[in-house]
């Protein structure tokens, strides 16, 4: 099956929040992305609401329910009590749990699964009882023991952190090394019964090689690069380009 594309709207929200104005509209840009073929929308609401605001979530939920009922809403975040309540209110199809400190600019490392096993088991169990698919953020070189914990706590998927790959893409030797890590980790996860997502610093240029090396990839979530490209090419054309890259 082709890799699914979930468009992360955080960068759109950050641009909006530079001024006390209602535009660019997160919902309107989400509608364009879905209309161009994106399979879903992703947001990462942080406690300080510096990009996505809590008030955005019901509007995105309604957009998908009313106009694109075959698409998915993915909410990322650290599983604090406030976050879990927000998710339960919004009812996304997928919840991606990340080990971020609230002050971080972006997610930049995966879970230490053995260290946080009990904590994750409680959070994942709570979400699964509500019927959500749960993905856990994982380092690109997470080993079998770590991934086995992800499976044991009830996760459906892991999202592989692709930041190191994106950072060295212009260096063929380093990029090849990172791809081998991702390929190995994805195969291990799949062998344990975990589906595999990926995200962070993915671009229309580096996506095809990732898809080639990780054929089991279920979904990528892309925000910063896609939004930057949308400033030049428009959201609809940019989404079409990323969808083509997912099929390369």
UniProtKB/Swiss-Prot annotation:
Keywords: Cytoplasm, Pyridoxine biosynthesis, Transferase
Compartments, as annotated in UniProt: Cytoplasm
GO biological process: pyridoxine biosynthetic process
Residues that coordinate or bind 1-deoxy-D-xylulose 5-phosphate: 46, 51, 106
Binding, 3-amino-2-oxopropyl phosphate: 8, 19, 201, 223-224
Alphabetical list of Pfam families matching this protein: PdxJ
GO molecular function: pyridoxine 5'-phosphate synthase activity
Catalysed reactions, as listed in the record: 3-amino-2-oxopropyl phosphate + 1-deoxy-D-xylulose 5-phosphate = pyridoxine 5'-phosphate + phosphate + 2 H2O + H(+)
Active site: 44 (proton acceptor), 76 (proton acceptor), 200 (proton donor)
This enzyme's EC code(s): 2.6.99.2
Gene Ontology CC terms: cytosol
Residues marked Transition state stabilizer (site): 159
Biological role stated in the UniProt entry: Catalyzes the complicated ring closure reaction between the two acyclic compounds 1-deoxy-D-xylulose-5-phosphate (DXP) and 3-amino-2-oxopropyl phosphate (1-amino-acetone-3-phosphate or AAP) to form pyridoxine 5'-phosphate (PNP) and inorganic phosphate.
Xref: NCBIfam families: pdxJ (TIGR00559), PRK05265.1-4 (NF003626)
Name of the protein described by the UniProt record: Pyridoxine 5'-phosphate synthase
Source organism (scientific name): Chelativorans sp. (strain BNC1)
Gene: pdxJ
